Amino acid sequence: MEELTLKSFEEAAEKVKEATLPTNLVYSEYFSSQTGNRVYLKPENMQYTGAYKVRGAYYKISTMSEEARQKGLITASAGNHAQGVAFAAKKYGVKATVVMPTTTPLIKVNRTKGYGAEVILYGNVYDEACEYAMKLAKEKGLTFVHPLSLIHISEPTRRVVIS
């Protein structure tokens, strides 16, 4: 596994600037008083997709080989990660498939489709959708983009610390 370093964070931060908006830090009087520290909030809901998840997805795609990009990618999500992957894939011209539980709110399904992803509704809960997405990835030779467990996802997500 790759090592997380300040340099890797900085490289990820630079790369995701291509697909994200800068967001300001907002001082929180409430949380500062509750913790005895100066606490600032970073409104990542102001990103194009409404969440920080686009950072990890975009960076992950940037690290994929051209061959892997040609084959496409797949993920499972019921919301923000789905939209982040769809948005990032569209920016790179990569075919994205998103497996979402059948219980996913229609607005999330439609926004994901709106970014160009193929959406497959499968299973009642995330775990079922994820299992199916991993099965399809293996069968079709697609890159599976996990919402949490990859260094490529965590580096740009933690980029918030740098900014």
Report each predicted region and the residues it spans.
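Helix C-cap/helix->beta junction micro-motif
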Residues: 35, 92-94, 140
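General beta-strand structural signal in soluble alpha/beta enzymes
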Residues: 23, 27, 41-43, 75, ...
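Short glycine-rich anion-binding loops that position phosphate/pyrophosphate groups of nucleotides
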Residues: 45-46, 80, 149-150
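Positively charged, low-complexity intrinsically disordered leader regions
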Residues: 2-71
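Conserved beta-strand segments of alpha/beta enzyme cores
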Residues: 38-40, 95, 118, 143-144
